[in-house]
């Protein structure tokens, strides 16, 4: 079992007034560090999310013409692939 520290109440495991007084000077710095760390991590997350989720409609990319024969062949390949995947499940 864990031994309680001198700075903890042995019955409730709460910090004693001495421990609270000892930690008081560091509260502001620790909170500043926490806010800075969360801000940087959140900023990176938001930047990445916005960079990856741009509205790309690919309007400037030319689409090559597809003949009816090629389209029919692609549809057959797609249907065959779908059947194979369904059989695997």
UniProtKB/Swiss-Prot annotation:
Protein location: Mitochondrion inner membrane
Alphabetical keyword list: Membrane, Mitochondrion, Mitochondrion inner membrane, Transmembrane, Transmembrane helix
Membrane spanning residue stretches: 29-51
GO BP: mitochondrial cytochrome c oxidase assembly
Classification via Pfam families: Coa3_cc
Entry-linked InterPro entries: Coa3, Coa3_cc
Ranges in the topological domain labelled Mitochondrial matrix: 1-28
Mitochondrial intermembrane side: 52-89
Membrane topology: Single-pass membrane protein
Keyword Secreted belongs to the record: no
Gene Ontology cellular component terms for the protein in this record: mitochondrial inner membrane
UniProt subunit comment: Component of 250-400 kDa complexes called cytochrome oxidase assembly intermediates or COA complexes.
Role description: Required for assembly of cytochrome c oxidase (complex IV).
Name of the protein described by the UniProt record: Cytochrome c oxidase assembly factor 3, mitochondrial
């Amino acid at each position: 079992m864990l031994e309680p520290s001198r700075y903890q109440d042995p019955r409730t495991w709460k910090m004693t007034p001495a421990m609270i007084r000892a930690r008081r000077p560091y509260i502001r710095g620790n909170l500043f560090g926490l806010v800075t760390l969360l801000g940087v991590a959140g900023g990176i997350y938001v930047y990445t999310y916005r960079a990856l989720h741009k509205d790309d409609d690919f309007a400037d990319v030319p689409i090559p013409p597809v003949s009816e024969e090629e389209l029919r062949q692609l549809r057959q390949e797609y249907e065959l692939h779908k059947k194979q995947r369904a059989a695997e499940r």
